[in-house]
Amino acid sequence: MKHILHVVLALSALSAGQRLWAQATGKTETIYSFQAPPGATYPAAGPIISKSGVIYGTTNSGGTTTGCGFFNCGTVYELTPTVPPSGALTETTLYSFTGFAGGAQPNNRLVFGASGTLYGWANGGAFGQGVVYELTPPASSGGAWTETEVYSFQGPPSDGGLPVGGLAIGKNGSLYGATYFGGKYDQGTVFELTPPASVGGVWTLTVLYSFHGDGDGIYPGAGVIVAANGVIYGTTTQGGALGVGTVFGLKLVAGAWKEEVLSSLTGGVSNPNGLAFGPDGVLYGQTPGDNIFEAMPPAAAGGAWTVQSLYNGFGLSGWGYIDQPSIAVGPAGAIYWTTTFGGTSTACGVSLGCGALNELVPPTSPGGSWTQLVLHNFTGQAGDGYQPNGGLVVTKNGDVIGTTYYGGQDFFGTVFRYTP
């Protein structure tokens, strides 16, 4: 199903009374408003963008299949710029989820595989523990995408249960991720899905690590990220020395995966739910309480990682509460993220605030301070979205693109773009 919608609104990025260290400039605009089923409705995760500028994502409602709630079982969507460019996007529903046994209501970001293939996971599956799927583009223009079930999680003790966050893809085409439950101790896992050796073969799941809580982290709250050297990094929401979470690494040593707690977190940085790569091996992360932190690798082999809070905005005007991991790093080293609640506007009818798009600008000299900016306070009014959630994309020219769960022209959510 296709819809064409023109850019509906250009919005001011600022409003009076924000607590800022510097004046933000730029423009935030709604570039697409989702519509009622059978189209895609309520995007619960951020988008990804192809080299040609096509936007892909998931919604946990909408589509053609009923029986999963009031607004159907969810979709994978595609938003294609018109040719020649006119500011319009054409929506195509690539796949409508079929129900809980076949997967339903996805709430995580997609990841690109080879030749434009898309991977993600959805709730449900054969055992009700989540299912990883593959979407293969058509062989010729105008054809249909093909959905294939990659793996249905079985839960403990066989493997993980309830994947969290998005998947990551390695150089070998393997998919990596984390589950909140499951594994040998039912406290979460990190897993690898290895593609088949030949067409038509079966993917193989390997539990790389089962969290156990003995000084270790437990219950990962987000997916993992994979470095160029193959090291896997992630976070747990609980466990560690103080019980408030960890930053961990997994490295292949002599043919076996070895887990290392890089940092046991403290009350100042607790219950993390996502990481992103920064420059020179630095990791940036976030917590549900709107804390942005930095994990610095040791200067010398055998040294300790250092974690420090870059910003703690919980409870401050213009900032708020993070629902899903959204952190992204721009080409100039700035950190971007959204808060689902908070901000200065309650015009959407949410007393906790309609959400905000935020930026941390790195210091210009070593030892300097990061500069905090609110780029946009969502309002839910006049086509604006509200309650942003899920990941952001920062383009090469510095635009920031994300989604809101609600709002827009028809109140079924939006795709927004911030232009510096």
Placement of each model-derived feature along the sequence:
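Extracellular beta-propeller repeat domains
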Residues: 2-420
